[in-house]
Structures are given as C-alpha cells and as structure tokens.
Amino acid sequence: MKSNFLVWASLGSCFALFVVPLMLLGTVTPSLMKYATESLDDNGRTVGELEALGTIGSIIGTFLPTFVTIPAVGTARTFLIFAAILAVISLGFFISRKKWVARSAVIAVVITALMFMPFNYSFAFWEDDLTVEDESIYNYLQVRETDESVILSTNVAFGVQSIMMKSGGLTGMYYDYALAAPLMAEKCEDVLILGLGTGTFAGQCLKYFPGCSVTGVEIDEKIVALSREYFGLPEEVNAVVGDGRAYLTTSGTYDVIMADAYQDITIPFQMSSVEFFTEVLEHLNPGGVMVVNMSMRSDAEGSMNEYLMDTIASVFPYCATVKVTGGSNLELLATADAEGFARLAERIAALGEDDALSAIMSRVEEGLVPVEGGGLILTDDKAPVELLGMRVLDEMISSELETLRGQIKENGIMSLLE
C-alpha cells in the first residue's frame, strides 16, 4: 500500500499557505475588467490589455524570486517584499476610493518595516551552532563546525552533502568507498567530478593518488565559494561552475569520472539517463572507471537505485555496487574494461597493512555485488527521479512511524518525551 506521505504533506502545506491568498488574488482580474470597462465598444481592447499585463506580471513573478530576490535576500524576505508590493498597491486603490486608508497604510508600513528589520530567519531554528546558514538559486545551505570536522548540508533536517576532516584523513563516509575507482582505473592521471560539492572527494584523490589532475564541476556558485572559505579546497583542483552534463559534452577524456550530483533527495534527471551514461563512457580513457554515488538506498522493487543500476548496466558491461556501512549510500563502480575488477582486487591485495586505504578498500572488496541489469531504464525523455526519490523518503517515514508505534505500544506515549 502506498503511503505518499510527502505528497499529502506538500499538498496540505500548499493549501494552508496559498489557497486563501490565491483565491483573493484570483478575483483581481475579473474585478478590474468590471471597473475598467466603460463601453461595450472598447471592452475587447480593455480585457486584452489587462490580460497582457497579467501575463507580464506572471512572468516577472516566476523569474524574479528565483533568480533575483531569493539568492539576494532569502525566502522569508522575498515573501515580505511581494506582500509589501501588494499592500502598497492596495493602499493606492483605497486612497483613490477614500476608504480604509488608515488601515491599509498601517498594514503597508508594518510589512515594509519587517523587510528591513534585522531578524534572524533561521530555518534550522533548533540549531544554535551554525557557522553559515544561507540560500542560493539551487540550495538551502548550512555549514556546521565540530571539533573533528566541517560539514555542509543542503537539507535543513538531515544529511551530509560534504565534509572536511580537520585531521586530513578519511571521512568514514561514502567518499572513502569511492576511492576504489582511482585504485581500479588502469591509471589515475585525470579525474572528473560531476557534483564537486565542497571538494571532499577531490581532496582525497590528491592526497591518496598524488600526481593526478582533478577537475570538479559544481552548478552552485555559492557552494564553490564555501569550499574555498571553510573547507580548504586545494588550489590544484580546477573548480568549474556549471552544469555537469553540459561540461562533460565539451570536455576531454578522463581516467576516473565520479557522478555525485544529488540535489537533496533526487538526482538531476539529465544526469540519470542512458544517454548521459553513454556520454560518460565516451569520455573515459581505456581502462577508465565511473563511480556513481547513490544516496538514500532502498531495497524495494522499482526503487531509484534499481532504475539507476539497470540504466548503467545497459551501457557499461562490468558493474558492481557496495553498500556504505553506517549510512544510506550505495556506491556503484562501472567500467568497460574486462580486467577492471580483477585489477582492483590485485591492487587491494598489494596494499600494505599500514596503508591508509587498506582497511576501507578491503571492506569495499568484501562488499562488492555484481550488477546484472534489467529493464528499468531511465531516458532523457522519461526519468521520473523526483517521484522515485519521494518513494524512498516515504519508506523512511513509514519505518520511523512503525518504530514510534512500537515504542508507544511498549512504553506509552510519555516515553517519546523522555
């Protein structure tokens, strides 16, 4: 039985926030038509002009918040800016009608004043130790520093997008598992990372595979800026701001290509399709390896992971996955080289016991599961990654609810407050 928690929660939230104001705004155009039409001879022109202005307003309202106000001042102040505009317009109307002038003026002044007040609009209001909380065109951004690490999250409640260990060592997360790719490649001279983040994997490649050249593509310019300021992204890393697939199309060839372009719970559809992975294969050198990070793994039939594995296996003849211990990530290694996985095993065996990669690579080798492939193929024309991502979150919510039900049944509802 499908629960669709996210769908219903999103629908309920949208109804609560937007139904009443949108219904009221929906009455504006018909009312204007009524008041502006003075003659049946001119009504067609009048209605057309109003509709044209409405269309222009819709276009401005769509693009101005996304590309200007939200990146510049954030979501909360964007709401206040547009509320103030509506309030000022209403004030002008009531002044012309000589009605409710004082009341409208007070509302307009209050909303306008709120825009300039130094409020701390924190989405993570329960956190008191955030180094940075910001928004960009693409992401909510949260930087938190601990004694051992600096962490970037693009989700207000959970998840780690990037991490820097102050000790300079391994992270204990999926980045360590992904280091199997440069170890597996015939040579590791050129590495491309699609979804650089703050450069965790890039820094590890330079540290554990000295001499390699690393290029990282990150679509979010603010994340690149954070990587330099807070995460110590090495200057040797060529950080490119742009879309990963667009960059890949015009780039050269590489020994290792990592695809790690998750945006919150989903992967961009254009970086999940059979056409994309075909392009990746074409940009790999002989003996090259692709590694894909799959976040929020699921064992359910028809999950996002299953779609991605089937899609990749339809392009790469040799694929295997490994589960990240203690996390929800699944790493997939893919190559067109028949000797690739045998070479990985040989190189892992050759690592000395005191080698920093020895333990984690042994864990990777033990956990590798070959991918057989199937018929669940994502294409540029059809890649429902958002729905697949929501399905995984629904599974997580259902699991948590079952845990809570069991706790309440066993210990009572007051146990939740302890």
Regions found by a protein language model. Give the residues of each.
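Soluble small-group transferase modules, centered on the S-adenosyl donor enzyme superfamily
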Residues: 101-174, 181-184, 321-418
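Short, conserved active-site loop motifs that form the nucleotide-linked donor/cofactor pocket
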Residues: 236-238
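Short beta-strand "acidic-cap" motif of Rossmann-like dinucleotide-binding folds
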Residues: 216
